[in-house]
Amino acid sequence: MKSKKLYLALIIGVLLAFLTLSSWLGNSGLVGRFGVWFAAINKKYFGYLSLINLPYLAWVLFLLYRAKNPFTEIVLEKTLGHLLGILSLLFLQSSLLNQGEIGNSARLFLHPFIGDFGLYVLIMLMVVISYLILFKLPPKSVFYPYMNKTQSLLKEIYKQCLQAFSPNFSLKKEGFENTPSDSQKKETNNDKEKENLKENPIDENHNTPNEESFLAIPTPYNTTLNNSEPQEGLVQISPHPPTHYTIYPKRNRFDDLTNPTLKEPKQETKEREPTLKKETPTTLKPIMPISASNTENHDKTENHKTPNHPIKEDDLQESPQENPQKENIEENIEEKETQNAPSFSPLTLTSAKKPVMVKELSENKEILDGLDYGEVQKPKDYELPTTQLLNAVCLKETSLDENEIDQKIQDLLSKLRTFKIDGDIIRTYSGPIVTTFEFRPAPSVKVSRILGLSDDLAMTLCAESIRIQAPIKGKDVVGIEIPNSQSQIIYLREILESELFQKSSSPLTLALGKDIVGNPFITDLKKLPHLLIAGTTGSGKSVGVNAMILSLLYKNPPDQLKLVMIDPKMVEFSIYADIPHLLTPIITDPKKAIGALQSVAKEMERRYSLMSEYKVKTIDSYNEQAQSNGVEAFPYLIVVIDELADLMMTGGKEAEFPIARIAQMGRASGLHLIVATQRPSVDVVTGLIKTNLPSRVSFRVGTKIDSKVILDTDGAQSLLGRGDMLFTPPGTNGLVRLHAPFATEDEIKKIVDFIKAQKEVEYDKDFLLEESRMPLDTPNYQGDDILERAKAVILEKKITSTSFLQRQLKIGYNQAATITDELEAQGFLSPRNAKGNREILQNF
């Protein structure tokens, strides 16, 4: 039996040794594929503890092997101690380094219930219990010293609080002076008093008190006045000993509180009051000002308890003489308290006033509350993508140092004061990318002076760029947004899994990212109803557009949403090729793009004609009636244009007019535009397009002029790039700063493959016209006669635009465009130039 146990131990030891070497040398390839695989798995689940967990396990198994009976209570208790130690290390590693799948999973499960503080308390508790179990330490030897220290500390704090808030508080009366050294000192003094009392009786009319009761008094009630030295906490009245002492046995201090005689009005009759009256001008000297009045009251209480002394009228007349003494003592107390009151200095009040840290912006919450929320019905024959297709969110958070914020506030205020701009920081709020300081200037400061200091403040704060909102809409403060020293990555999965996105009932919900305090932010494309996006190279424009497209794919099946993607650069939308949501193949030719826009405008007219028959105003109302009448419902049709500048350069007015028509009338019929451009200049974003696309998103642009073109104000040139953007919500005049979420190409491919595996794409062949041409056999086309009329009009007016022919010949826009292309094919007109105009060929 022993040999079998030994062989089993050797096999386990060799196996653990091999696995330990695999964990150490897995990446070197010396331990084979299995070793590399095991090292990766071990590090994934245990993090850095994977280097020591197997040797630790081997040591525990060796202790179990040496034990005669491994199932005894002591062995099981030690095993539990080892297990708690390992778990505490896993939790600590996960909290500090975010390593180890086991610790991360447990921490994520416990965090919503107990928070970060509870996790650290749990870790400390596990470490303490493991330490006590493994080292066989009784709890008394560990906790009792700390309990005694804690009790002493609480007692001292309680004493200080009573001294601060109760002017009649006495240390001896409350029993706080019963330390061993004081007790010994009192016993010595009591022994001396005992000898004096034996030699000299107190009074002829009174019996000598019991010696045992005198010696057994440890409380301050038996404090006597000694001739040799003044007692602590008393006022030295006279160098001569008093004429009378009254000594009482030990009494509980709570008996005094319940004694009805103490609640009666005290008569201030003392036998030593004549001495006080005579000696006060020369011998009144407070030793402890705080307890002087308390001692006097205590003496009054003792004399009040003596029933053998008659009250004389002379004494009652002399008692008011104590008032000057009390006033003198109180004056000394007030002087000393005034000298020892540094906590009420102006410096302390100034340092205690700190800006308020804001976790949620009220203006953003108001915008989000205006969206529609509710339950969304899941499609029957289609499975929406899950967030599991996206990469897991890295929980590594860059905690913002409050000292860094305080330093920035000091630098900011000092720099503003150099320009004679006074004010104070009222609120601060920090997010994943920037920290915003709300600066309230003095009444004499002009806001325009602060706007011109962005470069100076950026240099002072060593920031890449700062953005100044002067002022913030609806507030009396100026917003100064400063980049954080360490920025966080915002993942698309965070936004899609947020409560806002999950509970949004609109199928056209767009995930825009996070706001400047780190809260998710979404919007509804139906309420925008169109979106104009601008941003230079590297600003994160493509990342933001991809996040919007993916959020639409996460909400809608193919029969509810159709997309028309126009990608003149041929690389931005190629990853979405052949998804079942596409109405046409991804359009890369500008001429085909113009034809697609014209077809969308024609589809809009068709929808409105059908909606007028059913007497409805919106697509939602039409779809409800269509479902009840068995008619095909209208899907939402989203046109996504990646580069408007190339389209405008090629098509000019021919591209501008259909975009304007769709933007003007497409909302009620379920047609929406998402138009992006890299160059938001005046010739690209024309006044007609700006007027019909009120909701805009601007990533970082090159100049202030571009910012004013896209946003009608500056500020976009000061953005940080990498998804940092400004958004104009519908119905408001203000700007909302957001940070777009990031999704990798691999994540997009996973989502696209998941969608394509469920349903194949079905393109509408009649929707996309070849080179924006209508067939010559259209119903309203009259052949060569109308061509001759078109030539005559062009030669007479010298105008070659399609819209001009449309007005002169009184035909549709699509037919006029077809005639123009036919004239170009015949050589009558030249191709469009850079401005989108055609010329009449002279050699015709």
UniProtKB/Swiss-Prot annotation:
SUPFAM superfamilies attached here? Answer: P-loop containing nucleoside triphosphate hydrolases, Winged helix' DNA-binding domain
Ranges for the region named Disordered are 173-325
- Biased composition (Polar residues) is annotated at 220-230
Q: Name one GO molecular function term.
A: ATP binding
* Entry-linked InterPro entries: FtsK/SpoIIIE/SftA (IPR050206), FtsK_alpha (IPR041027), FtsK_dom (IPR002543), Ftsk_gamma (IPR018541), P-loop_NTPase (IPR027417), WH-like_DNA-bd_sf (IPR036388), WH_DNA-bd_sf (IPR036390)
Q: Which residues are listed as membrane-spanning?
A: 6-26, 45-65, 71-91, 113-133
The record's comment about this protein's domains reads: Consists of an N-terminal domain, which is sufficient for the localization to the septal ring and is required for cell division, followed by a linker domain, and a C-terminal domain, which forms the translocation motor involved in chromosome segregation. The C-terminal domain can be further subdivided into alpha, beta and gamma subdomains. The alpha and beta subdomains multimerise to produce a hexameric ring, contain the nucleotide binding motif and form the DNA pump.
What is the protein name for this chain? DNA translocase FtsK
The source organism is Helicobacter pylori (strain J99 / ATCC 700824)
